[in-house]
UniProtKB/Swiss-Prot annotation:
The active site is at K71 (charge relay system), S146 (charge relay system), S169 (acyl-ester intermediate). This is Indoleacetamide hydrolase. SUPFAM superfamilies: Amidase signature (AS) enzymes. Belongs to the amidase family. It comes from Pantoea agglomerans pv. gypsophilae.
Length: 460
């Protein structure tokens, strides 16, 4: 009933009493039961018990009665947190992560915890323990990851998701499933209460039906004191840079969908120009694995220590269920594959990259970068780490997402494939700190393209 209704409109109807919070909750629970095969939730017990009810204490809140679910590496008080790995079974969060606390204070209700790739170490959301997250827009195709469970639920009853993103874990699933995925400027929202991969790169994000909904949520979560320039003083349409390195090696379907979107933007007055980003691209490629793989082995145990779960550290590493994740982690535990000198060099270089990216925006007088979110379409056989055109599937997918993560840029993916086709995401990035400008401009582009409704006819 509420699948196509903008979030702001639905919130208004809840406040006016046109729609009841109980009705939304019941519809969401009904949809979860009907679509259990998509493995979107990690449940320890009854869904009815874990799906909160709207509290009268927050009835005046802007999101009162709106269900929000969280990736299962995000702490929600009194709910289990597994990070998708069996070794964390029995861990119950004693407090809320920052993003959870903020959404609860606005009146949102917790719908549960979403399935994910084990320990966030992958982009397919194949999970040996809790099942592979399904793709509601393209049944049988990969949902992406590591936050795949957050997108594997069709957008019924106003249900929204908050995942985390290290190198693309929000934006990859959004692109593969035909919805909007937003990663804020690194550090804009605190990552406290999130089981980490890398403190340098991790950020909480949003998965929403549309970019317009993401912009609405961003404004509520961040408030008015963001220090960002007013969007009203920025000229639209703006100048958009197309980084040449991120437009190469595309599948025909991806290339066609993304260039069609760019041409429509140009017809609407956007000045889209190709950029020579070769030096930046080469620098970024040296950073993809070094920092997260080095930081994980201190950040993850330290997080468990801070949560009082230090006794679980050995159990987690000993009981990793996914053979590919286990191989990676055990190889790094057995031997120092990344030296301290290499890690220090990578931190220095990530600082250089961030300076160079923001200088690029200024030098080229561009407001946004635009590029395909992924170079390949979602595979119909969901591989843990299979090979595509001679490169690992992981490397092929993450190559266009990791730049924004390393450069600390706000980034959003919006769907651009025609109805009935496999989903394709077009990515937009803005300079550091210009999150609201990014979201409002991308929402304007979304309206121009008319691609704001995910194609999930199979389930409705």
């Amino acid at each position: 009933m509420y699948r196509k209704q903008p979030l702001e409109s639905l919130c208004r109807d809840l406040r006016n009493g046109t729609v009841s919070a109980a009705e939304i909750r019941e519809q969401a629970l009904s949809a979860e039961a009907r679509l259990k095969h998509l493995n979107c939730f990690i449940r320890d017990g009854d869904a009815e018990e874990q799906f909160s009810k709207a509290s009268d204490a927050f009835k005046g809140g802007a999101l009162w009665g709106i269900p929000v679910s969280f990736k299962d590496n995000i702490c929600v008080k009194d709910l289990p947190v597994t990070a998708g790995t069996p070794g964390m079974t029995g861990c119950i969060a004693t407090h809320d992560a920052f993003i959870v606390k903020k959404l609860k204070s606005l009146g949102a209700v917790v719908a549960g915890k979403n399935n994910m790739h084990e320990l966030s170490f992958g982009i397919t959301s194949v999970n040996v323990q809790w099942g592979t997250a399904g793709n509601p827009a393209a049944p049988g195709y990969c949902a992406g990851g590591s936050s795949g469970g957050c997108v594997s639920r069709p957008w019924s009853a106003g249900l929204y998701r908050s995942p985390s993103d290290t190198g693309g874990s929000v934006r990859i699933p959004a692109a593969f499933c035909g919805i909007a995925g937003f990663r804020p400027t690194t550090g804009r929202w605190a990552s406290s209460g999130i089981i980490p991969v890398s403190h340098t790169k991790d950020a909480p994000g949003l998965l929403t039906r549309t970019v317009k909904d993401a912009a609405f949520l961003y404004g509520l979560i961040s408030g008015s004191n963001t220090g960002e320039p007013s969007c009203e003083v920025r000229k639209l349409p703006c100048r958009v840079g197309l980084p040449a390195s991120l437009w190469t090696g595309l599948d025909d379907h991806v290339e066609r969908a993304c260039f069609t979107a760019i041409r429509r933007m140009q017809d609407a007055g956007f000045d889209c120009v190709e950029l020579d980003d070769g030096g930046i691209y080469a620098l970024n490629e040296t950073l993809t694995f070094t920092i997260p793989l080095y930081e994980f082995f201190t950040d993850f145990p330290r997080a468990l220590l801070g949560l009082g779960w230090e006794q679980k550290i050995d159990a987690v590493f000993s009981h990793i269920a996914d053979p590919h994740v286990r191989k990676i982690i055990h190889a790094h535990l057995a031997e120092e594959l990344i030296s301290r000198a290499e890690a220090a060099s990578a931190v220095r270089d990530i600082g250089r990259l961030r300076l160079q990216m923001n200088a690029l925006f200024q030098r080229q007088n561009i407001g946004l970068l635009a590029y395909p979110r992924h170079r390949v379409t979602s595979p119909c056989q969901v591989p843990p780490l299979s090979h595509v055109t001679g490169r690992s599937f992981f490397a092929e997918v993450i190559v266009n997402t990791d730049l924004a993560s390393n450069a600390a840029l706000p980034s959003v993916s919006l769907p651009v494939a025609p109805p009935g086709a496999l989903p394709v995401g077009l990515s937009f990035d803005a300079p550091t700190g210009q999150d609201l400008f990014l979201l409002k401009t991308a929402a304007h582009i979304e309206m121009l393209l008319g691609t704001s409704e995910p194609d999930i006819r199979t389930y409705w």
